[in-house]
Amino acid sequence: MTSILTNNSAMAALSTLRSISSSMEDTQSRISSGLRVGSASDNAAYWSIATTMRSDNQALSAVQDALGLGAAKVDTAYSGMESAIEVVKEIKAKLVAATEDGVDKAKIQEEITQLKDQLTSIAEAASFSGENWLQADLSGGPVTKSVVGGFVRDSSGAVSVKKVDYSLNTDTVLFDTTGNTGILDKVYNVSQASVTLPVNVNGTTSEYTVGAYNVDDLIDASATFDGDYANVGAGALAGDYVKVQGSWVKAVDVAATGQEVVYDDGTTKWGVDTTVTGAPATNVAAPASIATIDITIAAQAGNLDALIAGVDEALTDMTSAAASLGSISSRIDLQSDFVNKLSDSIDSGVGRLVDADMNEESTRLKALQTQQQLAIQALSIANSDSQNVLSLFR
């Protein structure tokens, strides 16, 4: 039926045109934004996941920046420790040179003093962004330094920041700013050489292990010698010594003990001191810390071997600290690479969820444009029906 009040054909054509126009708007929006899911109304589940992951990716970007800052701190500390190790090696070499007979210890001490000043400069300069890992206040115990290492969201949705910790303690800092517990300002304990000797007491021979000294130790301590007997008047090695089986050991007056006499100077009968004071010590304090080395002082000059052993102990701790810093630096580099890859993976995953396929969208737009033209043509034809009715009355 043809009606001049209701044009069903035009209404159908108009509805189709509106639908096509709406689809074109959606397609053009996806093309202009590049997103298939641009809002929660497009796909609530995908939009929620994408929004959360984008937030996490921003946090990872901050982690990446923090890792760069942490790497700079660690690298600064490592470089300082590495330089300090080389300086301490030089100090050790100077001390070894000082053991030679006839050397000018005062001149060697001048060089050592310059090297000690260099160590102080290295420790003070090894600072980045206001943090120094080579010197610290250890009065309250070890100090923990942390570097941000990661951002984690667990299966329950809870988030946390992971950190890489490094302890500043007596074995890792060069100087304790409030005490003497750093590697360079503490006195190390060193092991003393020993010798096991048979000692006859009242006809019974027993084995005793006692501290052993070489003749150079005694000479450096300004000892006076009388055959197999020596006396050191003052300093760290002050006391009496006798030579037994090629080793110099602490001596004791044994006139009333029944012990075998090793040396008789006509006044005193000397034997091996088998008491605690004559036993070998495994925790003998070195004469000085590296920071207080002064071989012009008799107590240090007379015990250079122990001083060198103390420096060697310090080098061991410094090497260990440098190794720890190196391992942390390597870990930070690995973590940085991982964070970069993780960030790329998140970007890729979010893209799969919400990005528009531009090839598909452009093809769809072309089809919709064609449909729109056809719908406009159909609407035009439908609207012309009323004109055809009018012509019947002419």
From Swiss-Prot:
Signal peptide stretch: none
UniProtKB keywords: Bacterial flagellum, Secreted
PANTHER family: FLAGELLIN (PTHR42792:SF2)
Family that this chain belongs to: Belongs to the bacterial flagellin family.
Superkingdom per UniProt: Bacteria
GO cellular component, one term: bacterial-type flagellum
Role noted for this protein: Flagellin is the subunit protein which polymerizes to form the filaments of bacterial flagella. Homomer of FlaA is able to form a functional filament.
UniProt subcellular location: Secreted; Bacterial flagellum
Predominant cellular place of this UniProt entry's protein: secreted
Protein name per its UniProtKB record: Flagellin A
GO molecular function, one term: structural molecule activity
InterPro entries named among the record's database cross-references: Flagellin, Flagellin_C, Flagellin_N
